[in-house]
Amino acid sequence: MDLVVGRVAKAHGVTGELTVEVRTDDPQGRFVRGAVLRGRPPRGGAEREYVIESVRTHGDRLLVRFDGVADRDAADALRGTVFLVDSADLPPIEDPDEFYDHQLEGLTVITTSGGEVGKVAEVLHTAAGELLAVRTADDTEVLVPFVSAIVLSVSLDDQLITIDPPDGLLELD
């Protein structure tokens, strides 16, 4: 399974540098000089590999320069490109209370009383912590903080996440 670790938001400057939105919990390991990333263009087309020439932090994004991307036109052509890794290449997690995002996405979320909330559509990484974006049966989104006080258990085998939501968390009105 391919996992997205970053996406080109836009060109930065005139020398081929790109603004990349990070979508990995290990940007220091994935976005380093000399690393090779597999890129998929947004409008189809063939995937290709990109070698990182330089990288630096810019707010909550990275400014990345790739070998062979030497000007703004070349950088603009990459807008929307996503960078991928194969989930089979990820190291196993030793801690039973830690998960890769893709392991949580698609799991059914239920309350301690057994009521179904919905399915995890996405895991959001924010400055305040992780949030589970849960898509309900009526196609609304509920954000559930991924903290032990609310998320009581995660069963990958049963494909279930059990939560004990505080009053008001699931109120959608």
Curated annotation (Swiss-Prot):
Keywords: Chaperone, Cytoplasm, Ribosome biogenesis, rRNA processing. It comes from the Bacteria. The keyword Transmembrane does not apply. GO terms for biological process: ribosomal small subunit biogenesis; rRNA processing. GO terms for molecular function: ribosome binding. Binds ribosomal protein uS19. The PRC barrel domain binds ribosomal protein uS19. This is Ribosome maturation factor RimM. It comes from Mycolicibacterium gilvum (strain PYR-GCK) (Mycobacterium gilvum (strain PYR-GCK)). The lineage of its organism: Bacteria, Bacillati, Actinomycetota, Actinomycetes, Mycobacteriales. The gene is rimM.
